Design a protein with these regions (language model features):
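A short acidic, Gly/Pro-enriched loop at the edge of an enzyme's catalytic core
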Residues: 103-113
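Class I S-adenosyl-L-methionine
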Residues: 164-198
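Conserved beta-strand signature within the Rossmann-like core of class I S-adenosyl-L-methionine
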Residues: 141-149
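A short SAM/SAH-binding and catalytic strip from SAM-dependent methyltransferases
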Residues: 111-125
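Class I SAM-dependent methyltransferase Rossmann-like catalytic core
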Residues: 1-28
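Glycine-rich SAM-binding Motif I of class I
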Residues: 45-49
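A short glycine-rich, Lys/Arg-flanked "PGG" loop and its adjoining helix->strand segment in the class I
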Residues: 127-140
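Class I SAM-dependent methyltransferase SAM/SAH-binding core
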Residues: 51-92
Length: 198
């Protein structure tokens, strides 16, 4: 089944993600003039509209930046989201490695770093670097948000972040997570968690 931006399952997943992220972030994200979010390993950035909506509920303006190593997906994201967002939100997408954030001056100091379906157990060394550099780039009061497909992978990622000094301040087990059949125990945004810098 193709996962296009118009796929009905994808739209349901994004609606659920919006609800869960709002509940997760609301206690930790005060209102302000501007918010900057960095979306790591973003692919096509399908969740960009949801993220922009949530940010502009808390801020007058918002800027979203997406990073991924896959140039074709980044091209799709730039083509779609530069024209689809409301006037108070802007977005740009860059082909770059998440474990080399220190080389990238363009991203500045985001308020939020977001990693949807983090893939910690695929390569613990790389993902440890991604987490570490994301935390390092955040604003002093910044938040790191992850979602996970699997129970065990989420536990491993949470443990790694805690060992880096991050403080978990919220988590949600998604009651409406859509089961995927390509791997046992896999489902969409099964776990969500938010961390602050230690």
């Amino acid at each position: 089944m193709s996962h296009t931006p118009f796929n009905r399952f994808l739209q349901q997943d994004l609606s659920t993600l919006e609800t869960n992220l709002r509940d997760l972030l609301d206690p930790h994200l005060p209102e302000r003039d501007h918010l900057h979010l960095l979306n790591l390993a973003c692919g096509r950035g399908d969740e960009t509209g949801v993220l922009a909506k949530l940010l502009t509920e808390k801020a007058t303006t918002a800027h979203l930046q997406g990073l991924d190593i896959r140039a074709a997906e980044i091209d799709q994201a730039n083509s779609r989201w530069k024209s689809e967002l409301a006037a108070e939100s802007t977005a740009d997408f860059i082909t770059h490695r998440g474990d080399r954030l220190r080389d990238l001056t363009e991203i500045g100091t985001p308020d939020i770093a977001f990693l949807r379906h983090q893939n910690f157990w695929n390569d613990r060394t790389i993902w440890t670097q991604i987490f570490d550099q994301a935390l390092d780039r955040l604003d002093r009061d910044g938040l790191l948000v992850i979602t996970s497909y699997f129970d065990r992978e989420h536990a491993l990622a949470t443990q790694a972040l805690t060992q880096m000094g991050a403080v978990q301040v919220g988590s949600i087990i998604n009651p409406n997570s859509r089961i995927l059949t390509d791997a046992p125990g896999k489902s969409v945004d099964k776990h969500l968690a938010v961390f602050k810098k230690g």
